[in-house]
């Protein structure tokens, strides 16, 4: 399959932040997680970056919205941080039983932390226990509706189950929370292109990823060019627009 390295990296991108996960007062998030529940394609066009121009027509530098999860502040006990790091290390070493024990202990010692629930979900995914993983990720979102990592993990797991529209709905929730989430745009583009056969939607969100990351990923640039050849639609979010380049006045 084309660009397999990009797919492998991007579908994991939402979970690479090493954080124990703060707690917040969260409202109920309406997630479509039951695989037997019908899911319909929802529009995600409203979450695309919209560069602005000044009175001369010059593009202004784009100011991306901040990650709402990282903007949260909270105190986490030092011993919890150490235990969380140990759990992540055990997971990386495929010591799933030990990792699960540590994450479970963290959920019992501090019932407000969302991060350990993501960890439990990751353990379940590694063992292909997808339903259990989904339950853990949903719990993380219930505890902290701004934990963007949980949405990414949930969508990835739904994709692994073959529930592609459910995954699309979850990525839409992530972008509603943080419209300038680069990895959510890229993962959604992959989903649109490879699994849902919506190349134009894929192009728009892959453009968004390139725009928000200054076009640093050359593999994605090649993929985007290939999609654009298929759609025949010109690229609308040119990376150079972020540098306030002038456009001709009509």
Language model: regions and residue ranges:
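Short coil turns that delineate tetratricopeptide repeat
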Residues: 111, 145, 179, 214-215
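TPR alpha-solenoid repeat register
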Residues: 116, 150, 184, 219-220
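Structural signature of tandem alpha-helical TPR/SEL1-like repeats
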Residues: 93-101, 126-139, 161-173, 197-205, ...
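Alpha-helical segment of the N-proximal tetratricopeptide repeat
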Residues: 73-109, 122, 126
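Canonical tetratricopeptide repeat
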Residues: 85, 119, 153, 187, ...
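Residue-level recognition of tetratricopeptide repeat
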Residues: 88, 122, 156, 190-191, ...
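Terminal, low-structured helical/coil segments at or just beyond the last alpha-helical repeat
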Residues: 194-250
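Position-specific recognition of the canonical hydrophobic site in helix A of tetratricopeptide repeat
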Residues: 91, 118, 125, 159, ...
């Amino acid at each position: 399959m084309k660009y397999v390295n990009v797919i492998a990296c991007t579908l994991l991108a939402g979970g690479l932040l090493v954080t124990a996960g703060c707690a917040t007062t969260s409202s109920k998030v309406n997630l479509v997680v039951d695989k037997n529940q019908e899911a319909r394609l929802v529009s995600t066009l409203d979450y695309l970056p919209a560069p602005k121009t000044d009175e001369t027509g010059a593009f202004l530098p784009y100011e991306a919205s901040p990650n709402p999860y990282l903007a949260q502040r909270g105190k986490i006990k030092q011993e919890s941080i150490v235990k969380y790091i140990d759990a992540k290390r055990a997971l990386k070493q495929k010591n799933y039983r030990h990792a699960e024990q540590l994450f479970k202990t963290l959920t019992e010692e501090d019932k407000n932390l969302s991060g350990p629930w993501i960890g439990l979900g990751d353990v379940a995914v590694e063992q292909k226990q997808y339903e259990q993983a989904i339950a853990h990720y949903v719990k993380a979102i219930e505890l902290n509706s701004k934990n963007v990592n949980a949405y990414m993990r949930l969508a990835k797991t739904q994709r692994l189950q073959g529930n592609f529209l459910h995954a699309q709905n979850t990525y839409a929730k992530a972008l509603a929370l943080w419209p300038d989430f680069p990895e959510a745009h890229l993962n959604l583009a992959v989903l649109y292109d490879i699994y849902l056969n919506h190349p134009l939607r894929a192009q728009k969100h892959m453009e968004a990823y390139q725009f928000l990351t200054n076009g640093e990923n050359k593999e994605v640039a090649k993929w985007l060019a290939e999609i654009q050849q298929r759609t025949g639609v010109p690229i609308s979010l040119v990376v150079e627009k972020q540098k306030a380049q002038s456009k001709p006045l009509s």
